[in-house]
Amino acid sequence: MKIRNYNGEDLQCKVYIHENRKEETILVSVPEIFFSIQIDYDIYGEALVEHIYLHLFNLLDEKEANHLALSIAQWTAET
């Protein structure tokens, strides 16, 4: 499991990322905003950012949701 610190304009939190290689999924959790999402390996790049953004948009303002989505996409791409 990876733990990353997110420091946005209005939100500072920890992001927990767990990779399940057997099921080819990634679980992302942000407890501070009661958010979690399971992502399949076949979603990546701009599609991944958009997918995460659409879920975060319900919880955060547009700018913060986009910035956090970009950060999560970058962190999940790390090997």
Give, region by region, the residue ranges found by the protein language model.
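Generic, low-specificity signal for short hydrophobic/alpha-helical stretches with a mild N-terminal bias
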Residues: 8-10, 21, 34, 38, ...
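A short, structured beta-strand/loop element
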Residues: 20-45
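Negatively charged, low-complexity tracts enriched in Asp/Glu with abundant Ser/Thr
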Residues: 1-16, 47-59
